[in-house]
């Protein structure tokens, strides 16, 4: 509501009004009047009876509103009354007390800010949005794909962005999409999808309602939320599939979605039919054993379904991540705000259902440590060394995928990591070996650094023999 300052009264009448009306309430608010201003209004009414000429100083409708019933003490300020039309129109012309404008300002939520991380992506400096603990992961996952596709660009010095700005960029992208088919039916369907997507946009900042099916990595129950991904051409994947080598689980789960399966479990467990009870227990066991919402069969199907270089959204554990496929391996974009200053940490490998992963830079080169710049490990970050490490890592991943499903999963990868660690220890062993050589001399007899533990246990006996001699 706009606040209008009243016109200055005539010089001959100002003294009478100032004596009866408080300074903070020179113009009454009518039905919107604050309960604390009741006394001021009564005083003004008495002044109006004593000085009829003073009523010309106030709008005529505001004077009529003096007859409206007073609000009860302690009640909230009343809303617009269901009176006559002129009374509603004159409320806009009346200014409210100075205390009331604070209430809309206190109810207004503070904007959400997100830090922007700039990375080198395919030769161009590209922004990605990081998130805090409970950030809007659906919105960020979609927007990061649009940034990596260069469909949305930010100013070069942009360091912080709000959720409203992200929503505005996303809305512009949706409105700029044109239907590929010109038939009337398809255009109407396209317009309906656009309307559904624009309606769903506010939910992207809090979370989307998606219902995965256990039959395929791209199988979801269709909801209006899915229209956003369809319009933008962004694939939506998950890896929560039933292993076809478990026929009991396949029969128990069938082609149901997650919500339907939960309802079936509840129904079967309370059934008097033993077969239904057994089916419900098998389905419940499947949900418990796959609580990570990613199975080995799902990971294999996901790797096969994703296209090389494709940017997609991966759904797991109610979280949406930006995913890509590089050289037949899957990677998730690292958007944790804790890695904002880690330039060498951009992607995280997705090769295991247990969460054991490795960090990579924007070129998918393996990152060895956190918080260390180039050359911090004594030359181990040279291009030749980095290339060898990357090749070893890719070979280990390939061997892992060729393993039988009954094995321990990461045996070859762990072996490669162990060999890599031994190689690092050999590079750093030059100084300790020199110290051990020096310790054998008379000047360094008391030094024990670098000796094995068993050698230290046997040393006191040898020294005691020398002392006795």
UniProtKB/Swiss-Prot annotation:
Site residues (Ubiquitin-binding), renumbered to this chain: 412, 415-416, 419
Disulfide bonds: none
GO cellular component: cell periphery; cytosol
The protein's enzyme class: hydrolase
Catalytic activity: Thiol-dependent hydrolysis of ester, thioester, amide, peptide and isopeptide bonds formed by the C-terminal Gly of ubiquitin (a 76-residue protein attached to proteins as an intracellular targeting signal)
UniProt GO MF annotations: cysteine-type carboxypeptidase activity; cysteine-type deubiquitinase activity; K48-linked deubiquitinase activity; K48-linked polyubiquitin modification-dependent protein binding
Keywords, in A-Z order: Hydrolase, Phosphoprotein, Protease, Thiol protease, Ubl conjugation pathway
One GO BP: protein K48-linked deubiquitination
Active site: 137 (nucleophile), 319 (proton acceptor)
Region named Ubiquitin-binding domain (UBD): 388-426
EC number: 3.4.19.12
Location of the region described as Disordered in the Swiss-Prot/TrEMBL record: 1-85, 428-469
Modified residues (Phosphoserine): 103, 441
Biased composition regions of type Basic and acidic residues, renumbered to the chain: 34-53, 453-469
Function: Hydrolase that can specifically remove 'Lys-48'-linked conjugated ubiquitin from proteins. Has exodeubiquitinase activity and has a preference for long polyubiquitin chains. May play a regulatory role at the level of protein turnover.
Similarity comment: Belongs to the MINDY deubiquitinase family. FAM63 subfamily.
The name this protein goes by in its record: Ubiquitin carboxyl-terminal hydrolase MINDY-1
The organism's taxonomic lineage, starting at the top: Eukaryota, Metazoa, Chordata, Craniata, Vertebrata
